[in-house]
Amino acid sequence: MAYYKGAASEGGRAAQLMKRRELAQQEVEFRKKKIEEDLKVSNIENKFAAHYDAVEQQLKSSTIGLVTLDEMKAKQEDIVREREKKLAQKKEEKDKEKLKALEAKLAEKDRQKRQIQALSFDPDDEPDGDDANDGDEGSGKESEKEDVKEELTVVKRSWKEQVPSGVKKIRKNPDVDTSFLPDREREERDNRLREELRQEWAMKQATLKDQEITITFSYWDGSGHRKSVAMKKGNSIYQFLQKCLEMLRKDFSELKTVMADQLMYVKEDLILPHHYTFYDFIVTKARGKSGPLFNFDVYDDIRMISDASVEKEDSHAGKVLLRSWYERNKHIFPASRWEPYDPTKVYDKYTIKDKSKK
């Protein structure tokens, strides 16, 4: 180790200068690293800003008029996806160019080596020192060639690892049941089939409602006056009462000032609301307390004791009467048996008398 051979004060001064120099060098290195880090961050931010600005510009140019938030988000996602795809393609092209440049560099070195080997040299003309230098130069070229090959291999490997991510396609397994997945063609086919069936059913119901039936009824004012009228199955009880009223006004003077709203239709001991149609009772095969509501023909009395347990489709003539008459006589048989029609109520057996009275 060398020692300072001079005055002690000069030696201390030299030590301080050395220390200052080291501190200055450390500060320079610190600033250099900080500048490099700032440059890296700024490059990243610039790339991100450029990417974001490009996306925003493309989004503004492709958006026309007012759009919803969901449409804006979907369009933004599509633009970002396209932007990322383009960036990936550019990166892939750069990697390919770098690979081509390395291959060209390696090919050039191989060509130069072949040209050098093609020249003839007399080993006796050169001194031994030159041979040693040539050996060193050859070994240096070999090491440089190995470095280039290694770098080329690394680039090829990285490029092969990146390419499948964009090229590889996800294929379906034909053996997997995908019937539960949404399928636009299948849904459209099912919707068409449902619409065809609906139209076919609607046509059948319209044809059924247009069919005519003969309804036998009895005007009831304490005794029966039987008549019949032709109606369509799609007609309502109110329309039926209007037609009955037109027919009965000729024979009964008390009905000349009466409207259809003031009449009632009682079928199988049930008071039928005016808004129901004959089609409603026929389709549902509704039943009343003393017979079926869907059959409007007239038979003999079916409420015999011997036949009470037998299911029949014979029916009685429905009664058309004034609502005022019912209000006056609803405590007297047969009006005491009548009750409003309830579609939720089931009449399993027909009866001949009121069960509440024994």
Curated annotation (Swiss-Prot):
Coiled coil: none annotated. It comes from the Eukaryota. Residues 104-151 are annotated as: Disordered. Pfam families: XAP5. InterPro entries: FAM50A/XAP5_C, XAP5. Residues 104-113, 138-151 have a biased composition (Basic and acidic residues). One of its GO terms (cellular component) is nucleus. Belongs to the FAM50 family. This is Protein FAM50 homolog. The lineage of its organism: Eukaryota, Metazoa, Ecdysozoa, Arthropoda, Hexapoda.
